[in-house]
Amino acid sequence: MAEFVRAQIFGTTFEITSRYTELAPVGMGAFGLVCSAKDQLTNQAVAVKKIMKPFSTPVLSKRTYRELKLLKHLRHENVISLSDIFISPLEDIYFVTELLGTDLHRLLTSRPLEKQFIQYFLYQILRGLKYVHSAGVVHRDLKPSNILVNENCDLKICDFGLARIQDPQMTGYVSTRYYRAPEIMLTWQKYDVEVDIWSVGCIFAEMLEGKPLFPGKDHVNQFSIITELLGTPPDDVIQTICSENTLRFVQSLPKRERQPLTKKFKNADPQAIELLERMLVFDPRTRIRAGDALADPYLAPYHDPTDEPEAEEKFDWSFNDADLPVDTWKIMMYSEILDYHNVDAQNGEEVGVPQ
């Protein structure tokens, strides 16, 4: 049994194994608090994420279980990787991952990015997405703050708490508004990996321009801003709208023509604009895929088809439709954590699961 120590961070109790020291707050989200720490075993800096009250409701339990399963499954240079996980005696869950110094949001708010950095960051995002999508996973919440960067400009996609199966009947209100694909706003179902490509397009545009491309004040304003630049959605896209209220809203908007992106991004590389045009497309069926985007001429300095791997196997989503009580999710979580530590336990390492 691992030894646990307690520390107060922002009024929150961090109860972690003695393996981790020198805690310092990094950030807080809706579902958890993240601290940097020193791993005494490896002497490396790590990020420790505390999941707040993971067993308070079945919904939160399932969300945490999903994120844990994804972190265990996804192994790629451009995706954040899990290095440890444990449940404290207070039954909070802690994910330990590699620590990267900053994120794309902080970089974009501090200074304009030069062309070579934009290219390299975009390449790595798409390289990671190609792998994630090939595993049958849609991230659903890509935004600059979910893209971590270190001092060597290595980039990793993080925060898979909202990730879902590739499913033609997805539903729900997901993704930060500025980066949300129009098919989510228009239909709330029938969307797939292309929603992530739209988000990448918005992030790409923000790297080029230095500010968000579609900074909507609310759902309605967001869609209106999109149509000002990209024009009215084509009829075959409008026909896919399932909600009568949404359909009436879209039909009430003035007809608009798509504006050339060269007018919006006057100083950008023409090849960058050509690629952006293929990402910011209303019809997800014609939106470029991650693998094809990697082969675009704009990314030629970095593209290497022999080093852009896909997942070896699809992620197992069999649990995703389960409607289970908290106690069952808890047992499943314990099982996953014990499975993760199985190799370490065989080697005599401590396992952070309370008795």
From Swiss-Prot:
Catalytic site: D141 (proton acceptor)
Biological-process GO terms, alphabetical: stress-activated MAPK cascade
EC number(s) stated in the UniProt entry for this protein: 2.7.11.24
Phenotypic consequence of gene deletion: Reduces the expression of Msn2 and subsequent production of lamiocins.
Residue numbers binding ATP: V26, G27, M28, G29, A30, F31, G32, L33, V34, K49
SUPFAM superfamilies for the chain: Protein kinase-like (PK-like)
InterPro entries listed in its UniProt record: Kinase-like_dom_sf (IPR011009), MAP_kinase (IPR050117), MAP_kinase_CS (IPR003527), MAPK_p38-like (IPR008352), MAPK_Sty1/Hog1 (IPR038783), Prot_kinase_dom (IPR000719), Protein_kinase_ATP_BS (IPR017441), Ser/Thr_kinase_AS (IPR008271)
Alphabetical UniProt keywords: Activator, ATP-binding, Kinase, Magnesium, Nucleotide-binding, Serine/threonine-protein kinase, Transferase
Domain observations: The TXY motif contains the threonine and tyrosine residues whose phosphorylation activates the MAP kinases.
Similarity field: Belongs to the protein kinase superfamily. Ser/Thr protein kinase family. MAP kinase subfamily. HOG1 sub-subfamily.
Name the UniProt record assigns to this protein: Mitogen-activated protein kinase HOG1
Organism: Aureobasidium melanogenum (Aureobasidium pullulans var. melanogenum)
